Regions:
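Glycine-rich, acidic loop segments that terminate in or are immediately followed by a histidine
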Residues: 1-93
Length: 93
C-alpha cells in the first residue's frame, strides 16, 4: 500500500532532506500520501500542508502529522498539476 511504500522510501532517504509524494488510482478514488524526512521537517516542511496543496488538484482532502500525512481525492485528472504545484511549494521553502 502507499503508506508502506512511503515509509520505506522515507527510511531509505533518512539522511537526506526529502519529501515523498505518492498517489494511485484505486476503485474510482485517488488516495495519496506525503512523507517527509526529519531534515525536511526541520527545514519547515509540514506534510499536512503538502497534502492540502495536492488535494486541491484531485478534488481531495486529508491531513496528518508534519512527517506524514495522507488524503484521498475523487479525480486523478489534476494529479500532474498537483505534483507540479507541490514542487513549486517545496522549492519556495
Amino acid at each position: 500500500d502507499l503508506r508502506t511504500v512511503a515509509t520505506d522510501l522515507r527510511n531509505r532517504l533518512r539522511e537526506e532532506e526529502a519529501v515523498i509524494v505518492l498517489g494511485a488510482q484505486d476503485k474510482g478514488k485517488f488516495p495519496f500520501i506525503v512523507a517527509a524526512t526529519d531534515k525536511a521537517v526541520e527545514r519547515g516542511v509540514k506534510s499536512g500542508d503538502v497534502v492540502k496543496q495536492f488535494g486541491q488538484y484531485v478534488d481531495g482532502r486529508g491531513g496528518g502529522k508534519p512527517d506524514m500525512a495522507q488524503g484521498s481525492g475523487s479525480s486523478a485528472a489534476g494529479a500532474e498539476r498537483g505534483f507540479a504545484a507541490v514542487e513549486d511549494m517545496l522549492e519556495s521553502l
